[in-house]
Amino acid sequence: MTYNKETLKEAIVQKLRLNYGCTEQQATDGEMMKACAMVLRDIMAEHGVQTREETAHEEKRKVHYLSLEFLMGRSLMKNAFNLALLEPLTAAIGELGFKAADIFDMEPDAGLGNGGLGRLAACYLDSMTTLEIPATGYSICYELGIFKQKIVEGQQVELPDDWMQLGDAWLLPKLQEAEEVRFGGKVRTRWDNNHLMVVHEDYTRVLAIPCDMEIAGYDTDHVNTLRLWQARSPKPIDMKLFSEGQYLHAAEERAMADAISQVLYPEDNHYEGKSLRLKQQYFFVSATIQSITRKHIQQYGTLRNFHEKNVIQINDTHPTLVIPELMRILIDDAGMGWDEAWHITTHCVAYTNHTVLSEALEVWPQQLFETLLPRVWQILQEISRRWQQQVEDFFHDPAKTAKLAIIWDGGVRMANLCIAGSMAVNGVSALHSEILRKDLFKDACQMMPDKFKNVTNGIDHRRWVPQINPGLDGLLRDLIGEGYLTHPQELKKLEAYAGDKAVLRRLEDIKHQNKLAFAAFARKHQGVVLNTDAIFDVQVKRLHEYKRQLLNALQIIYLYQRLQDDPSLDLPPQTFLFGAKAAPGYAVAKRIIHLINSLADQINSDPLCKDRLQVVFLENYRVSLAEVLMPASEVSQQISTAGKEASGTGNMKFMMNGALTVGTLDGANVEMHDLLGDDNMFLFGLHADEVEHLRHTYDPNLLYQRDPVLRRVLDQLKVGFRDGVTYEDLFQRLVTGMDGQADQYMVLADFAAYCEAESRMRHTYRDRETWNRMSLTNIARSGVFAADRAISQYADTIWHVPYKQ
């Protein structure tokens, strides 16, 4: 069926009548949004059936992308855009008496992720679909998502994010495909005719119910699926206890099961939290691999060719338990011997590492495995024993054996399990992969050098330019055509216009219109009035000390003090925009949010700063906010400690929208610099090797004593701000290190260089032609950071699957 404005109107009206019992005149905006979603869902479901039939008929190798996060954002406009139905859908909504912008705005962000990890997974799913790779994403259907951030008296407060009230319109529950996941109990084993017989008894059952979200590709009928698992108890409420008045006890087992899919990253600084997190991870991978193997057997009748027809890509260490769980199925259910099962597992699982931070390389208490996952624990012990023997035979070095051990000193190391059980291990930027090879996983790389690869991250450029920045998209189509939508390297053609003053003026006007649009958004949603004549200087990302929002705050204090000293100081007006969520248990990150808000309160209420300096913390940073902010941004702050950021993807989105980067040589900034040179970004700070070299002798207290400018800035933390809040704890953390190493992330070491880079940026901003030319150059050279390039690299070097060229 061909869809146009009229057929879409008919379909929407029918959905309203059949699902909500109302006419278009009676429908609410929410009902209208869900009706539109259902219409698009039906179109995608039809395409999905055709895609799966074709994949099965041609016996194509499938990619299974496992990630504890998928930060999908909103899907209505995205799916309409990919299906080439955005214009007719917008017109249909209008003719039914609604404002299309209001309907698109009704959709909540799907609460299935936190930061870059989840957004990357979402971008990759779009790209795999557009490139017509048969792929399924797998995650948990978190009912309350990460959390909704509220700023109260300058501090972060976490509220539940009930996104499914409206967001469930995309989900298709598949009750008939539910899987059973087992926790606890006892395991008995015996040998019968040279076969190991395993009996698991007295376990607790949890049902995993799949809810499927169809994913449309751009300019293709190919549709892939994101499968989200909901946890439910198979047991009904205990009616005997309920009738006796023991209501909570009667529903206890049900509540314990439901908790598994309730919240992303439950706090784990206590035993119960750790237990719930491990349950989440095992629930997710067990349901997933059972589903994959079941479908494989239905098609091929055997698991002996499983590795030839399936690739399991694990996004960070959270899905690592898929390795022992696949082994369990192959040995216990399929009756294979160890060697055959291990061969299959290690020829289909691939691992993407996303961090060099030691605290993020998961280590689980052995005791949790013994009690929660007794059979998996047995398999882990055997994997560990054999791996340890392999390491010993290679190195004959007890220290290296200990470092690479999977089970050691009462802990189970997920990253080492990934290395042992995967066919490929990749980093996500050239610098990050080099650190993995030469430092973090140096010994493993020495054993298996061919296993380690690099695939620099990429972004869904179709979402992050044409969908969110129609002004820029219009300019690009006028100048270079629409080929860049499917071949992002064609953005390079834009560089031919770097000397065209009319084009540069048009680019500047597009940016100004986007600033006005974001200012209207900020006023509506946060009640803040932005100075649109100021530089929009933006740092939005997860709040972590290594990302150094604190360095940015100190630089703002320095700028404010300069204005206080000399009110006639000639500086271009500057608006600093922050957006970040801190993990609920990360006290220091929460204090940095509080500091930024104290600073904002001080500066924004000082008449001296009016129309000159402004600081705004954007509440509840999320994908839909980023979609309005990034086209309006002029300066992109990418200032992590060199060697700590694996890649980053926000830097790529800003670059593609023409913002100029102030940044360190860290993560993908290194590759951006390779493309742009010193002339088109503002670099500063220590390099990764310099950070490690300095660490042995670094004394931030000495910097504090010797540098009067820095000392005055830091003393302001102790004095505090007009809200009466002081930050002695942050001062101590930077200068003296009360509970460990002072200034672990080299904030003070890079402070002077950062202030100088900001000064260079402000100076360049005054030269509008130069600035706009730099902006155009950034856009023109950003095509390499498209997810299509990254996915084609995965397909060629790791997955070995064909794709649409």
Regions found by a protein language model. Name each.
Residues 1-805:
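A conserved ligand/cofactor-binding region detector
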